[in-house]
Amino acid sequence: MKLSPVEQEKLLLHVAGELALKRKARGLKLNYPEAVALISSFIMEGARDGKTVAQLMSEAKHVLTAEDVMEGVGDMISDVQVECTFPDGTKLVTVHRPIQ
């Protein structure tokens, strides 16, 4: 299987997001990279499912709460930006203050 660098990055982000989801399910508080990976993976999968940019920007704010992450992590993540492929082209999805 040959993947372009962009495809490799998307695959790595997906794997990191799945690992973060498993750790969250075990009751572990997520660190910064895990939190960003989980939110980013959620956005990418939502785009694949056909959701709009506006829907993803809104829904991604409910993926994690301050209780799900280690102390201070929520304050460290001011924005999450993910470039996703939608039916009408590639778009940048930006979620401001995703952990509340």
From Swiss-Prot:
Which pathway features in its UniProt record? Answer: Nitrogen metabolism; urea degradation; CO(2) and NH(3) from urea (urease route): step 1/1
The UniProt entry lists the main location of this chain as cytoplasm
Of the GO CC terms on this record, one is: cytoplasm
Task: Please give a single GO biological process term from the UniProt record.
Answer: urea catabolic process
EC number(s) given by UniProt: 3.5.1.5
Q: Which SUPFAM superfamilies match?
A: Urease, gamma-subunit
- Enumerate the UniProt keywords alphabetically: Cytoplasm, Hydrolase
Any GO molecular function: nickel cation binding
Q: Where in the cell is it found?
A: Cytoplasm
Record's catalysed reaction(s): urea + 2 H2O + H(+) = hydrogencarbonate + 2 NH4(+)
Ranges annotated as spanning the membrane: none
Q: Name one Pfam family in it.
A: Urease_gamma
What's the subunit arrangement here? Answer: Heterotrimer of UreA (gamma), UreB (beta) and UreC (alpha) subunits. Three heterotrimers associate to form the active enzyme.
Q: To which protein family does this belong?
A: Belongs to the urease gamma subunit family.
Q: What is this protein called?
A: Urease subunit gamma
Phylogenetic placement of the source organism: Bacteria, Bacillati, Bacillota, Bacilli, Bacillales
